[in-house]
Amino acid sequence: PGLMQTPIPPWMTLFTAIFMHGSIMHLLGNMWFLWIFGDNIEDDMGHVKYLLFYLATGIIASLTFVVLNASGEASLTPCLGASGAISGVLGAYLVLHPHRRVSVILLRMMVDVPGYIAVGIWFLFQLVSGFVDQGGGGGVAYSAHIAGFVAGMILAKPMSFAWAREETDPLIV
């Protein structure tokens, strides 16, 4: 999304932008996070609800970017990638699996930490980077990441099966 002319109706760009990426590294980074966190959330929601959740958080992230950048030079900046939807998955992971262990690289070693620490550090980085880069010149839509994350946290329980049952997570150590 952005406010530029496109060959498709502008409202469609909210959907299509989720499936476009600016570079191979952008795509690979998003797919890495989706691979680590997405399967758990899909298990919690089922295939159809997960697809709807993914699209909803991606569209909410894109709309937030457009609203916050609707004037000036930033309005012509395209916003694309799955990062807003992936951020939604991370928000859902924080709500549904805060204590599940996640492997992270720390000082050239693999360390298992609770999900709330791994996701919390990622979110803190998004917040700080978003405030530092308010001009939007860095090429990263931090506002979309933050909006997708918050949307994911809000939608996680209503869209999952976990709210209806006592959650027992066998991977908590």
Which residues make up each language-model segment?
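A detector for small-residue-rich transmembrane helices and their helix-helix packing motifs
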Residues: 1-173
